[in-house]
Amino acid sequence: MPNNNIYSTVEKLNHFKQKELRIHAIIIALNEEDFIAETIKPIYDHCSGISIITQYDRDYYGRMIEPDATIKKVLDYPDPEGKIHLVVRRYNDETASRNHEMNAVLFDASKNIQTHGVDKALIQGFHKPPDYFLICDADEIFDIATFPAIVEYLEKKKPDGMRISGYNYYFTWNRREPREKYVHRHFGFVKAGIFFQQRRVINWNESRINKWMAKIGLPKFGSYVYNFIDCPWEVGMMHHAGYVRRDKTQLIEKMQKHSHLEAHPPEFLEAILSKEYEFTDSKNLPINIQKGNWPDSFFEKK
């Protein structure tokens, strides 16, 4: 049973008033016990809400999997402000699951209700829709030192969508792919009311227009039309641990649960295992990664 005393505190009401830009995070997590708490840490203070979507014991193809402690990690996470929403639902499509939760968060359920004793302002504050959604997977970790600058950049530019670039890591946090060769890059922020067409793609026409207009020297024209921008690397990046796993077996299991199996033929694993990387000393990693609660195997010494 919830502690109703929290609903009578001034601090609770102030929480809903104090943040000018409201950001609600949407995180999809399936067997991510090693990452989920560390994903929440750098964003918690900057979000009005955080939805963790999981199917618990199924992947998006309806196949049974052995669940790990992901849900327990979410339930055990310190959440004094009641921001974290754990969503356990049987979905069969990644895009639809993300859009469904975004739509649910946007619905103001506080309208036209009669309360049972809770301050109406608190109910309205809880259901106040966000300005933006932060979209990330459970293995996309932001730098706690630079995430505020990313939010400030978002608030300044006011785009309809903003892509975030991320470093890729392989097996351990010390094996990083040079960003000059490749960066993990997806929409990290989308304006409330905008939904996805496929996975992290908002509108395929953006890339089509960019491709056509590149022929006349306007490669970003489609992005301009849709008011989509990229967050500059110097402002902030995230750290993609998609291939950081305890061993090769767990990496294979991770890849088999992806919703984009068509992009992972058998030779893909070998390509991952043979990737060139630069050794990154642990002291040069974000402080929240350095001090995170990780398995010992996630770090190595040169």
Model regions and ranges:
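Short hydrophobic segments within beta-strands
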Residues: 26-28, 53, 241
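Acidic donor-binding segment of Leloir-type glycosyltransferases
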Residues: 42-92
